[in-house]
Regions:
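Short, flexible, glycine/charge-rich loop motifs used to bind or transfer phosphoryl groups or to couple energy/partner
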Residues: 3-5, 43-44, 144
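Active-site pre-Tyr helix/loop in NAD(P)-dependent dehydrogenases
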Residues: 20, 80, 169
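Proline/glycine-rich low-complexity loops and linkers
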Residues: 1-30
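Carboxylate- and glycine-rich phosphate/diphosphate-binding segment that chelates Mg2+/Mn2+
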Residues: 27-138
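C-terminal catalytic subdomain
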Residues: 138-170
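Beta-strand segments within the central parallel beta-sheet cores of soluble alpha/beta enzyme folds
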Residues: 1, 14, 121-123, 163-165
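Proline-centered helix-kink/hinge sites
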Residues: 12-13, 18, 51, 58, ...
Length: 170
């Protein structure tokens, strides 16, 4: 299953509580489904998947190891960059993408070096949220297309694949 408007049944009220600062899932209408048998990762986009409420609690991210913190942060950065340069962006998505990018650059090293820095962790969650808002309207691009294939085929973590590919696509 992949594509637009694929949810055929009524969904329950969705609340999102992210435990990493990267996917932006708490504000998007996208879901990614991995099939380990076929080594595919497919995206579904449907407005019914967008959470109605989100709680951004930085305490839930404190125990993350540095490599998860950095790669999920790079996922958020990639969302913001791809939304900013995408063809479907508008002024509001550009603003959200810029806010996300600024927050990520100001905080990603801080949380990598000090996992208990609550203020930096909160800022990374907010950045991920803004990036999610931006790419929900403007979509992602080539970086994610390649990263999804690498993740599906070879099990490479999504944020790591984004981090490696982003400079080459830019």
């Amino acid at each position: 299953m992949r594509g637009q408007l694929k949810v055929l049944k009524k969904t329950p009220l969705i609340f999102a509580v992210p435990t990493t600062a990267g996917t932006g899932s708490e504000t998007t209408l996208a879901a990614v489904i991995s099939n380990p048998d076929t080594h595919e990762k497919n995206a579904i986009n449907d407005p019914v998947l967008r959470p109605k409420f989100a709680v951004l609690d930085p305490e839930l991210t404190v125990g993350l190891p540095p490599h998860i913190t950095s790669t999920t942060g790079m996922d958020a950065l990639t969302h913001a960059v791809e939304a900013f340069i995408g063809r479907s962006n508008v002024k509001s998505t550009e603003e959200a993408a810029l806010k996300a990018t600024k927050l990520i650059f100001q905080n990603i090293e801080k949380v990598y070096e000090d996992s208990k820095n609550i203020e930096a962790r909160e800022n990374m969650l907010v950045a991920s949220f803004y990036a999610g808002v931006a790419f929900t309207r403007a979509y992602v691009g080539y970086v994610h297309a390649i990263a999804h294939n690498l993740g599906g085929m070879y099990g490479i973590p999504h944020g790591l694949a984004n981090a490696v590919i982003l400079p080459y696509i830019l």
